[in-house]
UniProtKB/Swiss-Prot annotation:
Protein family according to the UniProt entry: Belongs to the acetylglutamate kinase family. ArgB subfamily.
Superkingdom of origin: Bacteria
Top EC class of this enzyme: transferase
Enzyme Commission code(s) on record: 2.7.2.8
Underlying gene: argB
Record's protein name: Acetylglutamate kinase
PANTHER family linked to this entry: N-ACETYLGLUTAMATE SYNTHASE, N-ACETYLGLUTAMATE SYNTHASE, MITOCHONDRIAL
Role description: Catalyzes the ATP-dependent phosphorylation of N-acetyl-L-glutamate.
Pathway membership, UniProt: Amino-acid biosynthesis; L-arginine biosynthesis; N(2)-acetyl-L-ornithine from L-glutamate: step 2/4
This protein's UniProt keywords: Amino-acid biosynthesis, Arginine biosynthesis, ATP-binding, Cytoplasm, Kinase, Nucleotide-binding, Transferase
Chief location of this protein within or outside the cell: cytoplasm
Binding sites annotated in the UniProt record for substrate: G45, G46, R67, N159
Length: 260
C-alpha cells in the first residue's frame, strides 16, 4: 500500500452534482477506513463563478481556456471559490463521515503565487511552497479541501487555474496527482479512450485539433505536472464512483501522462 500522498483535483460539473459528491466522499470515507494513504482535494468551481457573473451582469471572458479576472471582480470570484464552493464540498464531506478541513493555496504558505499575465488581470501562477502544515493536517487524519484561490507576495487575492494549482500543491507535498473531471481522459478521433500519452503525442493531438479548448489547458497542465513531479499523472472521470477505490490505490482508469 502506497503511503505517498495523493492529490485529487476535482473539476467539471461534479460540484453541481450532489449524488456524485455523495458517492465520491463515501468512497473516500471507505478508503480512509482501510488505508493509510493521505488524500487531499483541490477544486475550482467555474460554474459557480459563471452563475455569479450572470447575476451581477458581468461579462465572462476567457483567453485560451483561462478566465480573465479584472481586479474589481476578484472579491466576488474569491467568495465563490474559497467561500461557497469550498464550504459546500466540506459540508458534503462531513455529511459522508469524512473529517475535512477547508483551505486555500495561501494557508501555511502551501503555494507561492505570482501574476501570470497582465492581460488576464488577477490571475496567478502557483509554485510549490511549504507543505509542512498541510502534511500535519493529513497526518492527523483530516482531508484537506483546497480552493484555487491564493495570495501573492503583496497579500493580493489571485485566481489560479485549478489544474495548475493542483500541480503546485502536489509538488509542495511530493505527492502523486490525479485530475478528476467530467471526461474519462483524452479521447482519440473516434471517441476511444487513450490510456497513455507522452508530451509529443499530446502536442500532435493539439495540432490536429483532436484536443481542443479547455482540454488543452488540462492536458498541458498534466504534462507539466508529470515533469514537475518526476512521475506520471492521470486524468480520469468521477462519473464511475465504483472505480474510485482502484484509482486511489494507483490503478489506471483514465489517461496517464508522462513527460517522455
Amino acid at each position: 500500500m502506497s503511503k505517498i500522498p495523493l492529490v485529487i483535483k476535482l473539476g467539471g460539473a461534479v460540484l453541481s452534482c450532489n449524488d456524485t459528491l455523495e458517492k465520491l466522499f463515501t468512497a473516500i470515507s471507505a478508503y480512509q477506513a482501510s488505508a493509510q494513504r493521505p488524500l487531499l482535494l483541490v477544486h475550482g468551481g467555474g460554474y459557480l463563478v459563471d452563475d455569479l457573473m450572470k447575476k451581477l451582469q458581468l461579462e465572462t471572458i476567457k483567453k485560451e481556456g483561462l478566465r480573465v479576472t479584472p481586479k474589481a471582480q476578484i472579491p466576488f470570484i474569491a467568495g465563490a471559490l474559497a467561500g461557497t464552493a469550498n464550504k459546500m464540498l466540506q459540508g458534503r464531506a462531513i455529511k459522508s463521515g469524512v473529517a475535512a478541513v477547508g483551505l486555500s493555496l495561501a494557508d501555511g504558505g502551501l503555494c507561492q503565487i505570482t501574476e501570470l499575465d497582465p492581460e488576464l488581470g488577477s490571475v496567478g501562477k502557483a509554485a510549490p511552497g511549504n507543505g509542512a502544515l498541510v502534511s500535519q493536517i493529513m497526518a492527523s487524519g483530516y482531508l484537506p479541501i483546497v480552493s484555487s484561490i491564493g495570495l501573492d507576495a503583496n497579500g493580493e487575492l489571485m485566481n489560479v487555474n485549478a489544474d495548475q494549482a493542483a500541480v503546485a500543491v502536489a509538488a509542495a507535498l511530493d505527492a502523486e496527482l490525479v485530475l478528476l473531471s467530467d471526461v474519462s481522459g483524452v479521447l482519440d478521433g473516434k471517441g476511444h479512450l487513450i490510456s497513455a500519452l507522452t508530451e509529443q503525442q499530446a502536442e500532435d493531438l493539439i495540432t490536429q485539433a483532436v484536443i481542443t479548448d479547455g482540454m488543452i489547458v488540462k492536458v498541458r497542465a498534466a504534462i507539466e505536472a508529470a515533469k514537475a513531479l518526476g512521475r506520471p499523472i492521470e486524468v480520469a472521470t468521477w462519473r464511475y464512483p465504483d472505480k474510485l477505490a482502484a484509482l486511489f490505490d494507483g490503478q489506471n482508469i483514465g489517461t496517464k501522462f508522462s513527460s517522455s
